[in-house]
Amino acid sequence: KLDELESLLLDVVDGIFQNQAELDAYPHLSQAGVGDLRFVDTNDDGLLNGDDRTNIGSPIPTFLYGINLGLDFKGFDFSVDFQGQTGNKIYNAKETVRPDLYNFEQHVFNRWKGEGSSEVEPRATAGGYNFQPSTRFIQDGSFFRLRNVTLGYTLPTGMSDRIKMTSARLYVRGTNVFTLTDFTGYSPEVASNSSIENGIDNSTYPVSSIYSVGLNLTF
């Protein structure tokens, strides 16, 4: 739930109910069972409701950056372009519509199977309680990407003159070569059609990696 454009307001997950005694001793919603997520009663009133939701961070990056480098040497030219961002949170909403029962995500293999088996992934269920909005689906949106890299070679003037051209340049180029991120969605550059859904990833289409070879000829 978005409280303001700058904040994500969610229930806070604090592990998994490992046994019935633990479930009985802690505030929980009526549909919770052993192996389900344990939510924090942040105001200590003995109830779990909207008053327990907590501002867990902003979907807006605190820092955006880019790095551009270029080098020319004896006919060779090299350029590289990096970009990145840090300081933002992403709500990975695509995982809320892929219940563990269908094994769409690999983390289902680490699910709770019995007491002590997991403190992170709840038992497999077909949606419901464990998929309500919470910090379970919050991830760091920071990333570092090699956006473009190009290596080219321009023929010496004497050689291009002999083939009756002003210049000839051969190059190879890579676009979106790699992205370093802890985000498990398709792309940390989350797109939204609504300003109130900023930072909510509903399966943003991933950026494509493109590799090309080209030849620039000037007559």
Where are these regions (language model features)?
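Extracytoplasmic gating/loop element in the C-terminal half of outer-membrane beta-barrel translocons
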Residues: 1-36, 85-169, 173-175
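Acidic, glycine-anchored loop motifs typical of Ca2+
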Residues: 15, 33, 41-52
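Outer-envelope beta-barrel architecture signal
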Residues: 63, 74-76, 142, 164-168, ...
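Outer-membrane beta-barrel pore domains and translocons
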Residues: 72, 83-85, 173-177, 218
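Repeated loop/turn-to-beta-strand initiation elements of outer-membrane beta-barrel proteins
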Residues: 75-79, 158-159
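Membrane-embedded beta-strand positions of outer-membrane beta-barrel proteins
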Residues: 80, 170-172, 215
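Flexible, surface-exposed loop regions and adjacent strand-edge segments
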Residues: 95-104, 182-195
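Outer-membrane beta-barrel "beta-signal"
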Residues: 153, 207-219
